[in-house]
């Protein structure tokens, strides 16, 4: 049963781009995307604070679900919609502070054991990856493939789930067919020859998410 320890999110979050700049946040919100993540890696809080503030303000303006990757203190300070954490970040994060601030929490997983860890935290949603080989970040684990993804989605039947990792426009329909509630994309949009067209096509497949 879906009873998160954090505020709930819709079962279907729809198309969920993960981007590294405020410029991309603004572009995609303007293109109709309503679930996004700002993921800026390996910089100090004070270096990214202005970007976090700007992204959160844009999210509010468009009434969107904007998650901040990793920088949970800044997300709390500036009242983001939510925070996304990797497995390696869970232990070093004050989950009670995120909960007390009323922020949603998403957690990355790569196998059944990590799903167990995520479920113990009772987050708002669980990300399942990486589905296919990905160039976006170095991954110590092997790609799960569609069959494994479908098994995880079935296990988490009533939990909001997000598929991530190598999800392209061509692969997106098969990923959605597993029953997963959302697809997270990176290069499928940011490296597309025509990002507006790619975004529109992906929105047609994955939707904007439930209210």
Curated annotation (Swiss-Prot):
Cellular component annotations (GO), alphabetically ordered: cytoplasm
Record's keyword terms, sorted: Magnesium, Metal-binding, Thiamine biosynthesis, Transferase
Binding site for 2-[(2R,5Z)-2-carboxy-4-methylthiazol-5(2H)-ylidene]ethyl phosphate: 134-136, 166, 186-187
Biological process terms in GO annotation: thiamine biosynthetic process; thiamine diphosphate biosynthetic process
Pathway: Cofactor biosynthesis; thiamine diphosphate biosynthesis; thiamine phosphate from 4-amino-2-methyl-5-diphosphomethylpyrimidine and 4-methyl-5-(2-phosphoethyl)-thiazole: step 1/1
Top class in the EC scheme: transferase
InterPro entries attached to this UniProt entry: Aldolase_TIM, ThiamineP_synth_sf, ThiamineP_synth_TenI, TMP_synthase
Cofactor dependency: Mg(2+)
Binding-site positions, Mg(2+): 70, 89
Binding note for cofactor: Binds 1 Mg(2+) ion per subunit.
EC number: 2.5.1.3
Catalytic activity line of the entry: 2-[(2R,5Z)-2-carboxy-4-methylthiazol-5(2H)-ylidene]ethyl phosphate + 4-amino-2-methyl-5-(diphosphooxymethyl)pyrimidine + 2 H(+) = thiamine phosphate + CO2 + diphosphate; 2-(2-carboxy-4-methylthiazol-5-yl)ethyl phosphate + 4-amino-2-methyl-5-(diphosphooxymethyl)pyrimidine + 2 H(+) = thiamine phosphate + CO2 + diphosphate; 4-methyl-5-(2-phosphooxyethyl)-thiazole + 4-amino-2-methyl-5-(diphosphooxymethyl)pyrimidine + H(+) = thiamine phosphate + diphosphate
Molecular function via GO: magnesium ion binding; thiamine-phosphate diphosphorylase activity
Binding site for 4-amino-2-methyl-5-(diphosphooxymethyl)pyrimidine: 37-41, 69, 108, 137
Family membership: Belongs to the thiamine-phosphate synthase family.
Task of the protein: Condenses 4-methyl-5-(beta-hydroxyethyl)thiazole monophosphate (THZ-P) and 2-methyl-4-amino-5-hydroxymethyl pyrimidine pyrophosphate (HMP-PP) to form thiamine monophosphate (TMP).
NCBIfam families linked: PRK03512.1 (NF002904), thiE (TIGR00693)
Name by which UniProt lists this protein: Thiamine-phosphate synthase
Source organism (scientific name): Escherichia coli O9:H4 (strain HS)
This protein's encoding gene: thiE
